[in-house]
Amino acid sequence: MTTKRTFQPKKRHRERVHGFMKRMSTKNGRKVLARRRAKGRKVLSA
């Protein structure tokens, strides 16, 4: 029995779990975005 690849990418799942709207929907999510802005990240969220 071989080990399966654990990363099975799905665009919808990625957006819904790690997307901008998801980040904005919670207080801590907004903190994440603020930190990433402060750090100067080009991409803030998925």
Curated annotation (Swiss-Prot):
Region described as Disordered: 26-46
Ranges in a coiled coil: none
Any GO BP: translation
Cellular-component GO terms for this entry: ribonucleoprotein complex; ribosome
UniProt keyword annotations, A-Z: Ribonucleoprotein, Ribosomal protein
Protein known as: Large ribosomal subunit protein bL34
Similarity section: Belongs to the bacterial ribosomal protein bL34 family.
Annotated source species: Lacticaseibacillus paracasei (strain ATCC 334 / BCRC 17002 / CCUG 31169 / CIP 107868 / KCTC 3260 / NRRL B-441)
GO MF term list: structural constituent of ribosome
